[in-house]
Amino acid sequence: MAKDKFERTKPHVNVGTIGHIDHGKTTTTGAILAVQAAKGLAKAKGYSDIAKGGTVRDATKTVTIAVAHVEYESENRHYAHIDCPGHADFVKNMITGAAQMDGAILVVSAADGPMPQTKEHVLLGRQVGVPYIVVYLNKCDLVDDEELLELVELEVRELLSKYDYPGDDVPVVRGSSLPAYNNPSDPEASKCITELMEALDSHIPEPTREDDKPFLMAIEDVFSIEGRGTVATGRIERGVVKVGEEVEIIGLGPNSTKTTCTGVEMFRKEMNEGRSGDNVGCLLRGVKREDIQRGQVLAKPGSITPHTKFEAEVYCLSKDEGGRHTPFFSGYRPQFYFRTTDVTGTANLVGADMCMPGDNVKVEVELHKPIAMDDGVRFAIREGGRTVGSGVVTKILE
């Protein structure tokens, strides 16, 4: 367990890198760490450290899977940064990752321009509620034509506007991550990263934390620590959890379990409490490793209940957005992805005979397992591992 106390001196913001595979997301993350480390504001990490989390090789490259968490500071803020996987097959991680962002750095290779996954990630960002995007045009050193850069920038701005981001006002930083990663102390090489940090500080407002609401954390991972007990990790969605407080484990079964949180840690440092927006591990008294799983939530007792039936407003992705090619009808049985897990359920259309790709419809859903939910919670609709729609719970039925 952690030893150092976590110091809270600067406001805390969650960001992450999104964008097409091989456009340089992980290198950009490494460059930020290297440049900030040279200023004493971060610990540098190598590319392979950031890309770890199970790397699967395709024919030529190492495709980054899983979500890497790193931390660094700017002059004004403390950032927790996730390096989101860019590969279409790993959209599931993208969903768990993107749900954790106050803002995202959209990395686009200036040599290639926006690609299918660039679009997919912006769309996903819009769906899972990433409120702000800052654009980083990478590999500008490979493009010697100023007009081409202008063109790529225009293309990215149009793409953002299409998905309801303020495309005309979004900061676009031009740079090259590899030289900055290799020479972090060289002012010329690192200038683009300095500009990127300034853009993050100025364009992503300090998030209004939901500290005053009742505590809720979606469980992402569970592990046992010898002699200490069971730890559940995740991002605190709302509220505050203090060491010694009672919490409830809810979801994926009819019964909820009450337990006491006997320790909170963040980035291997012990804390007296965890607040909304923090990625923490909670040590739980008397809970066995097998009694708790990803997809459940930890919450203030009595503040949220598990449900299986609800009404929702659903958007079915169009074929061009990577959605279904055919309509669905009442009795449709996809997976519903809530917070950190997929649950199978049945959707029945309300006031419509069918839902075409690209349509918005009202549905009644019955899940096979109960999920902790309240009105306004968002979910993705998935088939065989790909996202075909997104929705928001409008009314809980039972």
UniProtKB/Swiss-Prot annotation:
The residues covered by the tr-type G domain are 10-208
GO biological processes:
translational elongation
EC code(s) of this entry: 3.6.5.3
Renumbered to this chain, region (G4) spans: 138-141
Q: Where is this region: G3?
A: 83-86
Q: For Mg(2+), which residues are the binding ones?
A: 26
Q: Name one Pfam family in it.
A: GTP_EFTU_D3
Molecular function terms, GO-annotated: GTP binding; GTPase activity; translation elongation factor activity
Principal place of residence = cytoplasm
Q: Which domain of life is it from?
A: Bacteria
Which residues does the annotated region (G1) include?
A: 19-26
> Which residues take part in binding GTP?
19-26, 83-87, 138-141
Residue ranges of region G5?
A: 176-178
Region G2: what ranges? 60-64
The record's section on InterPro entries has: EF-Tu_GTP-bd, EF-Tu_GTPase, EFTu-like_2, EFTU_2, P-loop_NTPase, Small_GTP-bd, T_Tr_GTP-bd_dom, Transl_B-barrel_sf
Reaction it catalyzes: GTP + H2O = GDP + phosphate + H(+)
For this UniProt record, give its keywords in alphabetical order, as a comma-separated list: Cytoplasm, Elongation factor, GTP-binding, Hydrolase, Magnesium, Metal-binding, Nucleotide-binding, Protein biosynthesis
Q: Name one GO cellular component term.
A: cytoplasm
Where is the protein situated, by its record's location annotation?
Cytoplasm
Query: What family is this protein classified in?
Result: Belongs to the TRAFAC class translation factor GTPase superfamily. Classic translation factor GTPase family. EF-Tu/EF-1A subfamily.
What job does the chain carry out?
GTP hydrolase that promotes the GTP-dependent binding of aminoacyl-tRNA to the A-site of ribosomes during protein biosynthesis.
**Which proteins does it associate with, and in what oligomeric form?**
Monomer.
Could you identify this protein by its name? Elongation factor Tu
Instruction: Please give the organism.
Output: Rhodopirellula baltica (strain DSM 10527 / NCIMB 13988 / SH1)
